[in-house]
Amino acid sequence: LDDWRGRLAVEIATARADAPLTTDRLDALVEPSALALFDQLDLPVYGSGFIAALDSLADANSHLAWWQGPERAQLVLAAQSVNKEHIDYSELEWYRVPFQTGRPHVAGPYVDYLCSDEYTITVAAPVHVDDEFVGAVALDLLIDQVERHLTPQLAAFGDDISIVNGVGRVLLSTSPTRETGDTIRGDDLVGFERRPCPGMALDVLIAR
């Protein structure tokens, strides 16, 4: 996401210099890179797009420029089709943490009632234009697909390996005693080697 957010920051700055940024203009900027991301990662990406900063667009208080699913169709929320002013994601982790910290964040696992209605993790990275937070690029991964894809690969390296997010919540594990959503922190970390995942707010915990 780092390369994309850098490019998008430049594109948004250029677009705003010409005219006020609207939802349609933002969608046109985001769509090519959002769709390309589905094929760029060695992971089963379910959704990809950009979450606009609140009150940053000329014609809406909030907006998700988002594509998802097997058809990679654009997401249209009920609130977007009736009244865009009613979408308030200010307290949702995948928006709130990048906004407050200025750093990428992995949210979840959680049930994504807004987009997929599935057990999901969201990777989000903030986008800034001249130090102004204008939104976050993000992607969704469905937990069941990630487990099928990565667990066999992890199992080849050991029977007690876990991938955890920044607060120690398990995304997936090869251990039969740990499930997605469990936490490993504090005294539970004794006996584990921690290896950070470059470019992502994730750690791999390997039992010594």
Residue ranges and their predicted role:
Residues 33, 90-115, 143-154:
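Short, basic/aromatic recognition patches
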Residues 42-101, 172-174:
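Extracellular/periplasmic ligand-sensing ectodomains of membrane signal-transduction proteins
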Residues 116-150, 204-207:
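Conserved beta-strands of PAS-like sensory domains
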